Amino acid sequence: ISLGRLGFLSQGIDNEIHSIIEAISNNEFYTEERLMLTSIDRIALNDSLSKMIALRHKVALNAGFENFRDYKFKSLCRFDYTKDDCFSFHSAIQKTIPPILSELNKVRKQKLQLSSLRPWDTEVDPDQLAPLKPFKNTDDFVAKTIECFTEIRPYYGQCLKKLSDNGYWDLESRVGKAPGGYNNPLYESNVPFIFMNAAGSLHDVETLVHEGGHAIHSIISADLPLVEFKDLPSEVAELASMSMELISMEHWHVFFPNENDLKRAKKSQLESVLSVLPWIAIVDKFQHWLYENPTHTADERENQWLRIVKEFESENGVDWSGLEQIRRCTWQKQLHIYEVPFYYIEYGFAQLGAIAMWKQYKEKPEVALDNYEAFMKLGYTKPIPEIYKAAGIEFSFSEEYV
């Protein structure tokens, strides 16, 4: 069984796999073996990052920069925003989103009839319902997604049909298949390729409409004369895909004809959109501190992480008692910190933009879609703020805008 399929099955309430997962996730495991393993990995991962920070700081000094953060902003070609804009984003998210998540957690706790909400309780369906099943098989998945996109605008359905007719996607999960999902532009044919691991879940719908947004972006910008114009920064590329996630949601009745299932799917999508914003802000704020203080110790690093996390999560209603040592190193699960430093906040900017696009679509659907196509046609021929302006939205990080 593939990991994607296992994850899908584990959301259910009456199957053997779920019982196995519960058995290996008991309190004794978490408080003894889990803590021991975490401690071993934690030291090794801390040592690795310490070495990376020292080398990266040396690279920055050799290049004439005060720290690696300033060097990296330059190398990432961040011409349209500064570190202060990032700080504004952190502050705006911290003041606006956690109170909403706190209210959602209160409802979750009540539905699950718990005396305290533990971290793992946030990953289960609060109504203890079986996982949603939006499609029967891959052919059904393809047909419904094309129908969904056609309802938004017929041209979008034609774009996906072009991929389907040419065999330009590999959607179904199978044993031995590489993990993940992506849209890969093919600049000669100008027909992109979509790869993912569908297992029959709501997450598969979210993934394909996301990658479908990228695919439409690739096709609409195909006539730009230079490949470099189509090489998009994430702030722009993800605006297309994340916007399509939310816009398409207005047509998810194709996948969920039952009204209760449809509401449940939309609620899940919106909760995930909101919950990712504080995490992005936490990770980015942490990285600024790491490279502004390159000689810090591992203990100082974990203390700082905990301080930042508590700024955003102190009142979210999740009980971490007995798990403090694990919480101090939860940053270690974010591979970006190791592999692609400072590459992450772009997704937060794009997510805010996508919410603005969805708001625009709810109010004036045709105007919003015209603006959607207008910004995609630009590729990367304009500065990011101008591209967002073409979309009819702002490239803003203020508390008021959020």
Q: For each of these PLM feature ranges, what is it?
A:
Residues 34-41, 82-87, 123-134, 154, ...:
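Glycine- and acidic
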Residues 95-96, 232-261, 269, 275, ...:
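Post-HExxH zinc-binding segment in Zn-dependent metallohydrolases
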Residues 213-227, 247:
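Catalytic Zn2+-binding segment of zinc metalloproteases
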Residues 62-71, 106-121, 158-164, 224-230, ...:
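Short, glycine/acidic-rich hinge or "gate" loops at secondary-structure transitions
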Residues 108-128, 162-172, 233-236, 265-270, ...:
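A glycine-rich phosphate-binding loop feature that marks nucleotide/adenosyl-phosphate handling sites
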Residues 18-26, 130, 134-209, 213-218, ...:
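Active-site-adjacent "gating/activation" loops or surface patches in catalytic cores
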Residues 208, 216, 246, 254, ...:
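C-terminal, non-catalytic "cap/extension" segments appended to globular domains
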Residues 1-132, 144:
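A well-structured
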